[in-house]
Protein backbone atom coordinates (compact mmCIF):
# COMPACT_ATOMS: atom_id res chain seq x y z
CA UNK A 1 0.00 0.00 0.00
CA UNK A 2 1.22 3.47 -0.78
CA UNK A 3 -0.07 6.85 0.25
CA UNK A 4 0.99 9.96 -1.63
CA UNK A 5 0.21 13.63 -1.29
CA UNK A 6 1.68 17.13 -1.51
CA UNK A 7 1.17 18.08 2.14
CA UNK A 8 4.91 18.45 2.80
CA UNK A 9 5.08 21.41 0.48
CA UNK A 10 1.76 22.88 1.56
CA UNK A 11 2.01 22.63 5.36
CA UNK A 12 4.50 24.10 7.79
CA UNK A 13 6.00 21.51 10.15
CA UNK A 14 3.67 22.73 12.94
CA UNK A 15 0.62 22.49 10.69
CA UNK A 16 1.74 19.06 9.42
CA UNK A 17 2.10 17.86 13.02
CA UNK A 18 -1.41 19.07 13.86
CA UNK A 19 -3.32 18.23 10.66
CA UNK A 20 -1.54 15.34 8.95
CA UNK A 21 0.51 13.41 11.48
CA UNK A 22 -2.39 12.07 13.59
CA UNK A 23 -4.18 10.74 10.49
CA UNK A 24 -1.02 9.16 9.07
CA UNK A 25 -0.13 7.54 12.40
CA UNK A 26 -3.61 6.06 12.66
CA UNK A 27 -3.51 4.88 9.06
CA UNK A 28 -0.14 3.16 9.29
CA UNK A 29 -0.91 1.63 12.70
CA UNK A 30 -3.98 -0.05 11.19
CA UNK A 31 -2.32 -1.43 8.06
CA UNK A 32 -1.04 -5.00 8.04
CA UNK A 33 0.12 -4.98 4.41
CA UNK A 34 3.59 -3.79 3.40
CA UNK A 35 3.34 -0.03 2.94
CA UNK A 36 5.22 3.18 2.35
CA UNK A 37 4.64 6.91 2.46
CA UNK A 38 5.50 9.30 -0.35
CA UNK A 39 4.89 13.00 0.02
CA UNK A 40 5.60 14.94 -3.15
CA UNK A 41 7.75 18.03 -2.99
CA UNK A 42 10.01 19.63 -0.44
CA UNK A 43 9.80 17.71 2.83
CA UNK A 44 13.26 18.49 4.21
CA UNK A 45 11.72 20.35 7.18
CA UNK A 46 9.36 17.45 7.85
CA UNK A 47 11.75 14.48 7.88
CA UNK A 48 11.58 13.76 11.62
CA UNK A 49 7.79 14.12 11.47
CA UNK A 50 7.60 11.69 8.55
CA UNK A 51 9.47 9.14 10.64
CA UNK A 52 6.87 9.58 13.39
CA UNK A 53 4.10 8.41 11.03
CA UNK A 54 5.06 4.79 11.62
CA UNK A 55 5.33 4.06 7.90
CA UNK A 56 7.54 1.05 7.16
CA UNK A 57 9.27 3.01 4.40
CA UNK A 58 9.36 6.62 3.28
CA UNK A 59 9.90 7.68 -0.33
CA UNK A 60 11.79 10.93 -0.82
CA UNK A 61 11.28 13.35 -3.73
CA UNK A 62 14.27 14.54 -5.76
CA UNK A 63 14.34 18.00 -4.16
CA UNK A 64 15.11 16.50 -0.72
CA UNK A 65 18.59 15.54 0.51
CA UNK A 66 18.36 11.74 0.37
CA UNK A 67 21.35 11.09 2.62
CA UNK A 68 19.99 13.46 5.28
CA UNK A 69 16.67 11.61 5.14
CA UNK A 70 18.43 8.27 5.41
CA UNK A 71 20.37 9.39 8.48
CA UNK A 72 17.10 10.44 10.15
CA UNK A 73 15.06 7.38 9.13
CA UNK A 74 17.62 4.59 9.57
CA UNK A 75 17.54 2.01 11.02
CA UNK A 76 13.86 2.00 12.05
CA UNK A 77 12.40 3.11 8.72
CA UNK A 78 13.40 2.19 5.18
CA UNK A 79 14.38 5.10 2.93
CA UNK A 80 13.29 4.98 -0.73
CA UNK A 81 14.50 7.30 -3.45
CA UNK A 82 15.31 9.46 -5.18
CA UNK A 83 16.62 9.65 -8.75
CA UNK A 84 14.78 12.49 -10.46
CA UNK A 85 12.05 10.73 -12.45
CA UNK A 86 10.73 13.83 -14.26
CA UNK A 87 14.24 15.13 -14.93
CA UNK A 88 17.26 12.99 -15.68
CA UNK A 89 15.33 9.72 -15.92
CA UNK A 90 12.86 11.16 -18.43
CA UNK A 91 15.07 13.60 -20.35
CA UNK A 92 18.65 12.48 -19.79
CA UNK A 93 20.80 10.07 -21.73
CA UNK A 94 21.51 6.60 -20.36
CA UNK A 95 25.01 7.81 -19.41
CA UNK A 96 23.53 10.76 -17.49
CA UNK A 97 21.09 8.45 -15.72
CA UNK A 98 23.94 6.10 -14.79
CA UNK A 99 25.95 9.01 -13.35
CA UNK A 100 22.97 10.27 -11.35
CA UNK A 101 22.23 6.78 -10.05
CA UNK A 102 25.87 6.33 -9.04
CA UNK A 103 25.88 9.64 -7.15
CA UNK A 104 22.61 8.66 -5.47
CA UNK A 105 23.94 5.24 -4.44
CA UNK A 106 27.24 6.72 -3.22
CA UNK A 107 25.36 9.24 -1.06
CA UNK A 108 23.64 6.37 0.74
CA UNK A 109 26.77 4.33 1.44
CA UNK A 110 26.73 3.18 5.03
CA UNK A 111 23.04 3.91 5.57
CA UNK A 112 21.11 0.78 6.43
CA UNK A 113 17.64 0.02 5.16
CA UNK A 114 17.79 1.83 1.84
CA UNK A 115 15.99 0.93 -1.39
CA UNK A 116 17.09 2.79 -4.54
CA UNK A 117 14.04 4.15 -6.31
CA UNK A 118 12.72 6.99 -8.39
CA UNK A 119 11.71 10.27 -6.80
CA UNK A 120 8.11 9.88 -7.91
CA UNK A 121 6.24 7.86 -10.51
CA UNK A 122 8.04 7.01 -13.72
CA UNK A 123 6.65 9.12 -16.58
CA UNK A 124 5.12 7.10 -19.39
CA UNK A 125 7.50 8.63 -21.97
CA UNK A 126 10.64 7.59 -20.06
CA UNK A 127 13.01 5.81 -22.46
CA UNK A 128 13.45 2.13 -21.63
CA UNK A 129 17.21 2.59 -22.06
CA UNK A 130 17.17 5.08 -19.18
CA UNK A 131 15.30 2.71 -16.91
CA UNK A 132 17.78 -0.01 -17.85
CA UNK A 133 20.72 2.32 -17.07
CA UNK A 134 19.25 3.05 -13.63
CA UNK A 135 18.65 -0.62 -12.89
CA UNK A 136 22.12 -1.59 -14.14
CA UNK A 137 23.75 0.74 -11.60
CA UNK A 138 21.49 -0.47 -8.79
CA UNK A 139 22.12 -4.14 -9.60
CA UNK A 140 25.88 -3.59 -9.78
CA UNK A 141 26.02 -2.45 -6.14
Language-model features: locations:
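Active-site loop segments of alpha/beta catalytic cores
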Residues: 1-141
Amino acid sequence: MSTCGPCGSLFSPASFRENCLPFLKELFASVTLPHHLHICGQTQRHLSLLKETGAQAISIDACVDLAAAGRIFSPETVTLGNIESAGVLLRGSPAEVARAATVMMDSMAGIADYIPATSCGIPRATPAANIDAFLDVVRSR
